[in-house]
Amino acid sequence: MTFRFSAKFVATAVATFFAACAFAYSVTDAQGTRFDFEKPPRCATVVPAITQNIFAIGAGEYLLANSRYCDFPEEAKRKIKIGGYIDPDYEKIVSLKPDIFILPATADSRVARRLEKLGIKCFVLHGEGIANISADVRMLGKLFDLGKSAEKIAADFDDAVKPVNSGGGRRAFFMFGKMAAGRGTFAGNLLTACGLANCADKIGRPWAEVPREFVLAANPEIIFAECESEKSRAETERFFRTDPVWRTTAAVKNSRICFVPRDTVIVPSVRVAEALKIMRAFLLKN
């Protein structure tokens, strides 16, 4: 009896041990859902920022597919395309059988619900915002078992985006074409991080085409503008210098117009640090 009991006990202990080892690690997403993994999961996403952060921490090999808008880094272009943010190709996603589909908290909940019904688990990151970028990087590090490299990238990012009063409270606009980034926008937060006063905050809307009388009253001392090419940069600068209202502003008169590469300011990924570096360097010189 003693031998039988011992054998049974050992068998149970061994089974329990291997059952416990079946899940090598667990990760909890931004919504508090726990996921258990034996190894780094194969994933898919339709969000450019998530794609960029996945590659930034060295987890690109686990990304099966992304959206048609995911074009950075170069390797991202070679991934299978599964539609876009508002029109994901559900059939193709299911056919790829990813372990998880990664979405931000701001994503349309209907997308997650439909994917869940199709048997695809959704891992949710935080919402948009400079403060959430490093949090998402750290979470992705845990997700792909790359915590050490992710922590370094997140820490470097946190250090890079610490508020610095290089702007001295000067009045500024961040322009996207003829639209100004106002309160609560990602680009507006960049102005705050530079120690600038965002003129567009007083408009009361996140995005607005600035009325001429408002431009005159605001009289910005600094203008930041996104550009995607030398051609768009030249066209935008020509607009500011020839427009009867904008050309009267202190910013234009003193040639304080700074152009920032579009892809560093429209995608809330770790590349935002590049935009801030450009902006702060300009402010220090001007």
Question: How should each PLM-predicted stretch be described?
Answer:
Residues 3, 15, 21-51, 147-172, ...:
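Bacterial Sec-exported substrate-binding components of ABC uptake systems
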Residues 28, 132-142, 151, 162, ...:
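Structured C-terminal subdomain patch of bacterial secreted/periplasmic proteins
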Residues 28-30, 82-91, 203-212:
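Short helix-initiation/N-cap motifs at beta->coil->alpha
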Residues 67, 186-207, 227, 259:
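His/Asp/Glu-enriched short active-site or ligand-binding loop at hydrolase and phosphoryl-transfer sites
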Residues 69-75, 108-139:
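Flexible loop/hinge segments that line or gate small-molecule binding clefts
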Residues 90-97, 118, 210-219:
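Short helices/loops that flank or line small-molecule/ion binding pockets
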Residues 126-139, 171-186, 234:
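Extracytoplasmic ligand-binding site segments that recognize negatively charged/polar headgroups
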